């Protein structure tokens, strides 16, 4: 009885901690969206193209240098903490900090010194406007490396709060400095405006690192007392610690690098092939700026919400795997995918219906290109949400290499497809859009086949896909006519768009509940679930 209770409490704690991080991620994405609006208007599409190119390289360097660190550190620290092995917990923390200081310094320095050569090799000599932005991002790699150790440590001792607060803190500084610096430097040209935008990323990382360092230093005296009293545990050698760190990080880094390198390959092929076809450099950069800073920023908000909710449940899959309970594993994966789709499907439909008006509202851009990108590109949101969750499920059942192999296969097909679309179909920025949709679809398909092969898992369809799709279809039709009606009467896009979004949320929720897409038991799992159920009963929706 006690064991069962403890297991439930542990599972509840995992969900609570995961939810804290999920909420922080949603807030961070929303801040990111809202500060990009003035940044885009101040800097312009060409500058945002340079910004997007520099950011692609920065993200790859960040993944190589620090992406696996939080997971590795949190995993090792949680094991030593469970054994009350404070001696080796301290040695793991020391080793991790030293690791990130060295790796971050080397990668940051190489990026700064060879920014010209990197830009020329990846994007071609016509895109040298990327260099100033890339140089500003070089020290950011170092800061994020160090930051990742502290985030991993706090997660390892069982609290997500420092990580969550630091992420929000980082994004606020990023927003303020990016917009301010771009406004000051835009008169010097697009390359300098892009550099101003990336300066915010650097200052945000610095602020977040200082915050985490202060929290750690406040906690350290209490922790060091435990280390000094620990006489039961023999210190591990640093060689052994680094070996375990490396083995833990490698699969995560490889999987993430394949995901991110697809973006670099896209931008590199796009830039070089279009240059060869005779496109002007400013047009190439401008189109990419619209794609990376308008379309992707907008899609990433619901994507963060869908994947964060799903990933908050994934740790439970690992627990069920350890217990050898296949039925529980199936239930955990099914619940994760279902909640992900309940958010991703209506978000995709909503963006396809209101994509143009939202783009006009946020970016004052009513062009056919931006409208088409968001309307046509919404399947990307569905496939990437689902593929992220299924990657987590495979990692949860200890099949760490499988997502890497699947991503490599999908990437190979993706590269062939984008070259054909760019070189022979002259589809410019649409080539990246369609290729990314294909990549996401292939990842979903391959991951699902792997789950069926390893644990005999097949996704339930009716409540996961059919009912949310039906509710979303009703929502889409109603929303379309509501927007058209309000705009016809008022001729104010902002009012029509915002009211239509409110109507869309209400219609979707009502139809989903009436079709029994969510059970009362599932609603209890939501934050404030009891209160939600009470109100739903009052309105006869349950």
Regions found by a protein language model. Name each.
Residues 1-31, 87, 91, 232-259, ...:
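N-terminal membrane topogenesis motif
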Residues 40-60, 128-129, 190, 194-198, ...:
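Interfacial/gating helices of multi-pass transporter permease domains
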Residues 160-161, 172-215, 401, 411-449, ...:
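Membrane-interface helix-loop junctions in multi-pass transport and translocation proteins
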Residues 13-74, 79, 108, 112, ...:
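Signature of the first transmembrane helix
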Residues 143-166, 379-409:
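Membrane-interface junctions at transmembrane-helix termini in multi-pass inner-membrane proteins
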Residues 67-82, 303-324:
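Helix-loop junctions and terminal segments of transmembrane helices
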Residues 2, 481-542:
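Membrane-proximal transmembrane or re-entrant/amphipathic helices at the cytosolic face
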Residues 116-136, 334, 351-381:
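Interfacial segments at transmembrane-helix termini and the short loops linking adjacent helices
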